[in-house]
Amino acid sequence: MGDGGYFFNFEKMSYVKGRHPAGCILCMARDHSPDVVDLSIWRDDLFIAAVNLYPYNPGHLLLYPVRHVEDVRELTAEEEVRLAAAQRWLLGLLDRACAPHGYNIGYNMGGAAGASIGHLHLHLIPRYPRETGIADLIAGRRVLVEDPRETARRLRELAAQEPFSMSRS
């Protein structure tokens, strides 16, 4: 812990400044590149939902447009409507799969805002009471209680049982 009650995660900077695949990683995931781990749980013609490879909590999802967009203001009216419906549906899946007590939902647009990927993506982060444990405080690390690949598997199964529909959203 640093001055003023701040926690420092020095590994985050090495990730931000480290080696990344050439090109947009979300476009590579969209195109099923063998160079990226496929953690997608759902896709349609406009959006893809995937488990975050570096989740804050189990069930941390990224919802992003199929086409490469870097600013929320670039979304079409059709994409905005679909985004809202997909977000609502995904929150329902997460409620059933993870039983969180709340959510953080938002964008990081631009490097100054914390975005390490240019492709616009909405974070859906399940939150739980007392989720910061002693290991987090002492080691300055998060303890992942579930492998993101397992989270993706569980959510894919649930999504197959309860398919997305614009009429239900």
Region roles according to the model:
Residues 1-169:
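HIT superfamily nucleotide-processing domains
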